[in-house]
Curated annotation (Swiss-Prot):
Organism: Anopheles coluzzii (African malaria mosquito)
Record protein name field: Saglin
Coiled coil (UniProt feature): 120-169
Lineage, top ranks: Eukaryota, Metazoa, Ecdysozoa, Arthropoda, Hexapoda
One GO term describing the cellular component: extracellular region
Function: (Microbial infection) Facilitates efficient midgut colonization by Plasmodium berghei parasites. Promotes successful transmission of Plasmodium berghei at low infection densities.
Amino acid sequence: MSVRDYSGVQVISSRKHRSMSRLPTVLLLLASAAVLAAGGQEATEDPFADETDQCQISVSAETMKSLHGGSMQPDGTCDNLWESFLSQFHQVRENLTACQERAAAGPAPDPSSQFCQQLLDDAQRQMEQEHRQYAATLEEQLHAAQQETQQEQEMKKALQKQLDALTDSRNALYIDLLLANIAIGETKQALSYYNLMPASMPIDKLHEQIVRFVYRVTIYQDQRLLNLMRFVRDIPSVEERRSLYQLAQREVQKRPSQRDGYVAAVYALSVREDLPVYQANRQLYDDLVRQSETRLKEQVANGNFKQAAELAARQPQHFRQLQTSLATIELKHWRKFDRFVPYANALPQPAQRLEVLRVLLSQIGDREKKTSHKYLVKAARQFDICEQFIGRGKVDQAVKKQLEELRGKFATFAKGKNYQHYLSESRKSSG
């Protein structure tokens, strides 16, 4: 056993003592010894103080060896052991202090979690780098796509412009063909081009263009208007027909040559035949047909048969609706019988002439039954001309039958006087 005295503390090393071999116990003893040593050192500074009590701590050699990590030599001096032990003690103390500080700050990270964190950080950095690269690639692709899209849009605009130009050219061609077919009276073909007009084209603008074309050339305007009336009848839409009728009416009213002639009558009768339009707007018919019919009757009564004859020649169906009215002389014009009676043979068709003669003989019977002779003489002259006209052409049996009926009508006015009598009188008077 060895004994070392350090300022009143004796450390006794003995191989026989093995009971104190645990590190915590020894560390506690050493800490107490260090405190006591410090207190003893302060006491020795006073020269007059009594000698402090000495404290002996017995530490076995085995304990010292275990505390020293098993590296203590058997023959090591006590001083060396003590110095080494103190050094180890201070190191342990520092380590414990550091551990205490770390414990106070927070739990120490698990080495495995540190490793995982490093892997996570590396993966995050790699993902961020890949994201930046991917974003840069996408940016380039987006820029390229934008440029390509812009080029395609420019190409699309150019193509659309060309398409619009072609569409405009096509529509202009359709309009030209439509107007050309109206001009020559090909109403069915004109209607096919009319139906090809695009829905985007305002229909009122198209109608205005059609009516302007009709009146573009003065010498053709009458015939073109008649063709237009036939064309309008074939349009399916009632509203579109009414629109064209109204535009045409305005132009007819502006022109005395049409307003005072047979053209106005054709227009009015065309509207009258179009029952849906007529029922929707009777004024289109009534305002013009009365004026037109009155003017034609005045002209015929005064011996001006041109407009009535043109109506009979160009529009026989429409003329048929007015022929009885035109052949009827108003009482105020009866004194102009000599001017009126040639009207019968001014008409182009046999049936039209016979109708005038029928109405004429009927009026003579109603108005001049006692003084009918001079009127019948003049009527017989016109009947003879009509009979010769019919004889030069081919007529059906209905016309021949009507001719014979009118011939017999002359014999009903005076007893013993027939058609031949009045015809002979007419030849005598004409010399």
